[in-house]
C-alpha cells in the first residue's frame, strides 16, 4: 500500500483574523490582488522581506499568527519577481496555467493566481514602514482544514451565494482533499479486578 499526500482541498473564506477559534490551523495557500508601494521602493532582498513581513503582520494582526510565514513568503515572492514580467507556477496537483506577474508602474505589482471567486469582495490593508506605505487589496485562498467540520465549511463558503455558484464546484473539483494517515492511540483503562 502506498502512502501519499495530495494537496489540500481549499475554499474561499474571509481573512483568518476575522474568524474565531480556528486561527491555530490556518494556512494561506494563495492570494489574488495587488500590492502598491508608495514612497521608498524596496531594492534589496532584506527590504523586500521587511516590507512583506510588515504587510503580513498588518493583515494577520501580528507576527504570531500561524499564517504569518506563508503570507510573508507569498508577498516577498511577488515583490521579488515583480520587477520584470515573470511566469511563476503557484503549485497545483495538475498542470495549471503559469501566472504572469508584472510591475504595472514602477511602484505597483499585481498578481493573479489560481481561480478565485469574484463574489468574495476584496479587502484593503495598509501599513506604513520607514519612508513607505504598502497597500494590499485583494482576496485570499486558505486551506479548508482550519475551518473545522463540514457545517462550518458550508457556512463560510455560503458567503454571497458562493455555495450555490458554479465556482464553488469548480474550486472543489480543482483541489484534491488531503489524505492523511491518522493513528489513534487509546488511553489504557484499568480493568476491574
Curated annotation (Swiss-Prot):
Gene Ontology CC: host cell endomembrane system; membrane; viral envelope; virion membrane
Major site of localization recorded for this protein: virion
Pfam families: Rhabdo_matrix
Localization in the cell: Virion membrane; Host endomembrane system
InterPro entries cross-referenced by the UniProt entry: Rhabdo_matrix
UniProt key word Membrane: yes
Keywords recorded for this protein, A-Z: Apoptosis, Host membrane, Membrane, Viral envelope protein, Viral matrix protein, Virion
Membrane topology, as annotated: Peripheral membrane protein
GO molecular function, one term: structural constituent of virion
Remaining remarks: Most abundant protein in the virion.
Sequence similarity: Belongs to the novirhabdovirus matrix protein family.
Quaternary structure, from the entry: Homomultimer. Interacts with nucleoprotein and with the cytoplasmic domain of glycoprotein.
Task performed by this protein: Plays a major role in assembly and budding of virion. Completely covers the ribonucleoprotein coil and keep it in condensed bullet-shaped form. Inhibits viral transcription and stimulates replication.
Protein name as catalogued: Matrix protein
Lineage of source species: Viruses, Riboviria, Orthornavirae, Negarnaviricota, Haploviricotina
Underlying gene: M
